[in-house]
Structures are given as C-alpha cells and as structure tokens.
From Swiss-Prot:
Native organism taxonomy: Eukaryota, Viridiplantae, Streptophyta, Embryophyta, Tracheophyta
BP GO annotations: carbohydrate metabolic process
Record's protein name: Beta-glucosidase 24
One Pfam family hit: Glyco_hydro_1
Main location: endoplasmic reticulum
Amino acid sequence: MVLQKLPLMSIGLLWLLIIVGPLVNADGPVCPPKPSDKLSRAHFPKGFLFGTATAAYQVEGAVNETCRGPSVWDIYCKKYPEKCNGDNGTQAVDFFYRYKEDIQLMKNLNTDSFRLSISWTRIFPHGREENGVSKSGVQFYHDLIDELKRNGIIPFVTVFHWDTPQTLENEYGGFLSAHIVKDFREYAEFVFKEYGGKVKHWITFNEPWVFAHAGYDVGKKAPGRCSPYAKDETVKGDCLGGRSGYEAYLVSHNLLNAHAEAVEAFRQCEKCKGGKIGIAHSPAWFEPHDFKDEQSGATIDRALDFIMGWHLDTTMFGDYPQTMKDIVGHRLPKFTTEQIAKLKNSADFVGINYYTSTFSKHLEKPNHAEPKFKQDSLVEWKNKNVNNITIGSKPETGPLPVYSTGFRKVLKYVKDKYANPEIIIMENGYGENLKENDSVENGTADYNRESYLKKHLWSMHKAICEDKVNVTGYFVWSLMDNFEWQDGFKNRFGLYYIDYKNNLTRHEKVSGKYYREFLSEGVRPSAIKKDEL
C-alpha cells in the first residue's frame, strides 16, 4: 500500500484532532461534543448564562409586610380556596424572609443568574403612585438585588407575573380595561428608574397567552373568568363572570399596548442604558396528529400563531398574525397606527418558557355559537396521535408529557420565522405530583426531573450547535418547590424540596445535584464587575 506524504503541519493537526477532539472557537460552543463527553457548562458558548427562576406571589409570602396591598391572587385564593387546591401565597415558601439563605442555595448550584418578579402591590400597594408608594417594599427589592450581585448572581427581573393589584381589578376590571395601559406604564417606569442601574435584563410580561386564556377564557387561573360552556374540566366551582372568545383577546390587546408603553419608558430611562427588555412567551410544540393528513400538518403553524405569534408577531412586526385576523375577525381588537409603531421591534430578545408538546388535529366543525380561544385556531390538542401513541414519554407522577425534541423544534422555528433573534430560555422544568407518596425521601429522589433536564439541555445544545440558534441563557423552573397557582403546593417543580410540614425546610434534590455538577465544569461568566456591586 502506498501512503501519500503529508506535510508535517498537516500530520500534527491530524493528531491534534484525534487526541483533543473537535476544534472550537474560544468563545463558541463545543460542536459536537465527543461521544464520550458528559454534557456540561463547558460545552456552551462563553458567557452563556445558567440560572433558576421564581415569581413573587409563588415564593415571597409576607403579604402583610412592607404595606403590601392585595393582588387578585390574594383575594381569589382566599375567597375561592377550592380553585387553588385549598392553598394560597400568604406565606408561600417564605422567600421574603429567607432570600439570603436561598441565594446561598443558588451559589451551591453554581448558577450565575436568577429570575425574579416584582410584586406590583409591594411597590404601589393600591396600583398607582398617587395612592401611595411603599418605601419599605421598594427597599426590599434593592436589598434582594444587591444581595444577588454581591454573590455574583445576575438578576433578571419580570415586571408583571400575573399579580394584578386588586384595587385596579375592583376599579375598572384590571386588564379588561384600557385604563391598565397608563397605570402599568407608570408602575414599570417607576421600577426601571429605581432599579435600572442595577438590573440590565427585564421581562415585561410572563406567558401572556396563558394569562389571557387561563384567566379569561377557561377560568383556570385568577380572576377565573369564562363562559360556562368553555370552563376547563379541571376547574372547581363556577366561572366568575366572563365571556369566552372575547375577553382573552381584549385582555391581550391591553397587555400588548401596556408592554409597548413600558418599553418606550425603558428606552427613555437613562439608568437603563445598555439593558435589554422582552417578553417571556410560553409555546408548546405540535406534531401532526396524523402525518398522512395534510390538514393535520397545516395545524402546526396555525396553533403556534395563536399561542406565540399572538404576542411575538405583534412585538416584532407591530400587528397580529394574519391567520388570527382572518379567523377571529371582529372579536380581535385593532391597533391604531400609533400603537403599531410602538409595538414594532419592541423586544430586544425573545424569552421562551418551554415545558411540553402535544399533537394537533384539524378541527372540522367549530361551534360558532360558543366561541372560545382554542377553538378559534381550528386546532384540537390531542394527547395521543391517530395510532394511539403518546408524544414523548409520560412519567406517572408528571402531569405533562416529556418531549425534548419539541424544545429544539420550537427554538429552530423561532430562529427561522423571526430572523434569528437572541433567545433566552426563561423557564424549563418538570412538575410532579407525588400525592400520598409525598415525603422528603421520595421528593428528593426526583430522577424523572434529572432525566428531563438532561434531555432538554442536550436538545438546546443541538439547537445551538447544529441549527445555529442564538440562545444566550437558560433558567430552570424552579429554584425550589413553590405555590403553583391553581395546583397550590401539590405540583412540585423545584431543584430544592420544600418540606411544608417542617418549617419550610429546603432539601437539595437529585436534580439539584445534577444541575450543580453540570455547572461545575467550565467557567462562570464574570459579568458583574466589582464597581457595579
């Protein structure tokens, strides 16, 4: 056999590739990892942020401290306990008092960022500045943000995570009224000016389609509004007023205009210069119910237009997707020319909360006499496909199917449709209800959650490496178990187990240990300079 002679440099490079593995740009991801590699932070781009997420009402508690006023969730869960599993956020998991301890839990995980939300009524107890400002409430978030930064953890702040001031709900119906736009801008502008010098990553609204649909179309979350024919089958008790097929669109319209006004205020804020702002969207992925059915395949784009394009198209392009205009018609409010101009390009990044996927089937015969949001998309959400197969896997304790392929597909979809924007994964996590088996021992042995995180981190890495998606950060939902809205405390998402029977003691779970070890390899971003502390 005759061997072709190679230059010494080529031979050296060949041996380097054999010994070291794939070459990588110093700032880029390792693409692909060696087959023997255990995925870790080291395989992601330099400066990629990893963190955990929470929300004020779900973790803070201390509802009577700092002169905090009531939110819709305070009143909803106390007045209708059956709609919140008999639980409420009065104490939640005591984060208000234990945040310093909990920040040490974040450090233990090797995370470098933390997503929190500000309670509107801890700043303005009755919704507006003219009704009073809680100085101690304002100081609480200063103290929290300062403590995070002292510990090298970058704060990401959500301005609104579903806790509308009850005063504004009573006065004009909250987000059902256009009055909310002015009041939200005032509140957002206040927190930007107060914290904008310390916080450079902002989210105006969390999961707007869920907020509108669950709260105003199927009655599943506060304020529990729906038409009786549209009420979600899991909801206990009656709809608390409402008009399905109409109110969700009105609420979202006001929310989007409030977002645009808040972004304008943010971009005019001197302290906020160099910061970024966006929305945390919450898409599922859809696979065709029947791959042989052309109509079934066409449902995917339509479903995504309704649950993501509804708010993402609008903040990118200035208006609703054409599919929504065509189908919803007069029930979909119209933007003015001025509103369109403010909405267009009103996000610096795309926040994505991803949990699960489902099958989509074309809805042949919608009932026009009983309009409702999901029906409007002409899509049926199906748990199993035409062959009676569940999407992904469905662990016994998990209420949602696990399908990490859907995560990657969502990311590629956003890249392709919206010209490769910066994407930050604001939430990704696994919930489980242990029921009668709930204990510290069983709750911390969360191997299903560990598996979920492994699969989704791999899918995200493939999206970055192979699909060239511009993902820059990832937050696990959640740091610890917390109050999960209509599920109360029964649905656990945390990397730390909260012992509700024993002084809310925190216990690291198997998934927490996995995330800690995943983040222990590679360099943490040094994004906080000493002069910023």
